Amino acid sequence: MARYTGPVCRLCRREGAKLYLKGERCYTGKCAVDRRTYAPGQHGQGRKKISEYGLQLREKQKARRVYGILEGQFRAYFAEADRQQGVTGENLLRLLETRLDNVVFRLGFARSRNEARQFVLHNHFTLNGKKVNIPSIQLRVGDVIQLKEKSKDTPLFKEIVDGLGQKTPPAWLELDVNTLSGRVIALPKREDIDTNLQEHLIVELYSR
């Protein structure tokens, strides 16, 4: 399945919730979800009764869209989460949160996860001092990512760097604004993850 390249605001409207796919725009009055609270399409304003399966499917789709994951990748993440000890839903969120692109976003080096993915693909960061361009790399406790020297002076990153520190990273991450680096200091717990998801619905869907 190809990655979605259409208008991302339609995805938020489809899910009926802000997925924060367009960075700062999502926090302004320009957000499509605030302006049009109904789903996109000709029949978007019609009221629909959603089945239990439909609710589970929508929650899975929402999770995929929030983290920018393809269907096959998402199934693989769920299978890994199910193999691990502990609560499967929480394991799933932990795997998604510790992806490199998500950590770049959480630290404030990007305004959206999609932007973070592009930054990683274009070699703007190092991981533990080495070049990295794979957004899906799973980070572990102690891993350090850093913005490359040659990237610091670009107009785009100057704007982002100026805003670093205005938003506090989650408790499991540590940001150093002086070295423009971030460290994973713990694995995220459920209470550390502010993503608006009901992961138990996803578990129920895959348990059918």
UniProtKB/Swiss-Prot annotation:
GO terms for molecular function: rRNA binding; structural constituent of ribosome. It comes from the Bacteria. SUPFAM superfamilies: Alpha-L RNA-binding motif. Residues 98-163 form the S4 RNA-binding domain. Signal peptide: none annotated. One of its GO terms (cellular component) is small ribosomal subunit. Part of the 30S ribosomal subunit. Contacts protein S5. The interaction surface between S4 and S5 is involved in control of translational fidelity. Belongs to the universal ribosomal protein uS4 family. This is Small ribosomal subunit protein uS4.
